[in-house]
Amino acid sequence: MLVLGLETSCDETGVALYDSERGLLADALFSQIDLHRVYGGVVPELASRDHVKRMLPLIRQVLAEAGREPGQVDAVAYTAGPGLVGALLVGASCAQALALAWGVPAVGVHHMEGHLLAPMLEAQPPAFPFVALLVSGGHTQLVRVDGIGRYELLGESVDDAAGEAFDKTAKLMGLRYPGGPEIARLAEQGTPGRFVFPRPMTDRPGLDFSFSGLKTFTLNTWQQCRDAGDDSEQTRCDIALAFQQAVVETLTIKCRRALKQTGLKSLVIAGGVSANQSLRQSLETMLAELKGQVFYARPRFCTDNGAMIAYAGCQRLLAGQHDGPAIAVQPRWSMETLPAI
């Protein structure tokens, strides 16, 4: 089965072609970072308009790179949620129009299920069951995964997601959008131990997260340094390191608890924050101690992309699932409501 995948949940337009027998044939991505950077964050209306502009050229590009014609596509998968409603509607409308024109089925994919399954595109994919840490700008969740659609939520953020905390903290410190890579870049030059930030919600049982207080603590520390006349680049680097260490250690502690609670030895990390090298190293060290294994997608498939949507959609299409002709999206959507296959 040859599936065209479309991703438009936020500020990246992703398109890919996935073959159920040959794997990923081609993928293309257009990022809107430069468009939104001047505003310090994503402007939903601008995101939607840019998706409209980029979608068809990217589809033509992917078909050409794969050496395929539209008539060879067997189905279209698209991100149906969660995400920005206008951006989602662009992808859904395009997918349903193409499916109607080509006489093929369409299927809406849960954005976070796409992230969760992205490591399946690698040469050594994880085997079920496993624990998944989903860390992105909108989500921080620990999920027990027994199969596609068989998800048990173990814990989640009660306020800011980890990626959101990175972006907001960076903005408060005067760094460029998106903030995660900027903080990681500065942290490489930071002085270990100069600042020590709290590890939120690690002093109590449970697997939930909270990063809003850490964001405020970081801002207060930065403001105190500035008030004392120390707003040097080195101080900025030291604070970035302390913040990143706090987030990484908090996530690692919670993942260790989740593995112990479930008795599993395999951990998948997915979502934009999973590209953070400090987080990867920390989790790899922890899994080595537990004699387990950690899995993640290659960096370009950690952020939003069409390949993960094409793959996830292909699995559901092969199981006989597809949508009707109605154009419908779900800006808020729990993965636990997805049917198992």
UniProtKB/Swiss-Prot annotation:
Matches recorded under InterPro entries: ATPase_NBD, Gcp-like_dom, KAE1/TsaD, TsaD
EC number(s) stated in the UniProt entry for this protein: 2.3.1.234
Keyword annotations of the record: Acyltransferase, Cytoplasm, Iron, Metal-binding, Transferase, tRNA processing
Transmembrane spans: none
Obligatory cofactor(s): Fe(2+)
Primary location: cytoplasm
Reactions accelerated catalytically: L-threonylcarbamoyladenylate + adenosine(37) in tRNA = N(6)-L-threonylcarbamoyladenosine(37) in tRNA + AMP + H(+)
Residues binding Fe cation, per UniProt: 111, 115, 304
NCBIfam families listed in its UniProt record: gcp_kae1, T6A_TsaD_YgjD
Protein's name according to its UniProt entry: tRNA N6-adenosine threonylcarbamoyltransferase
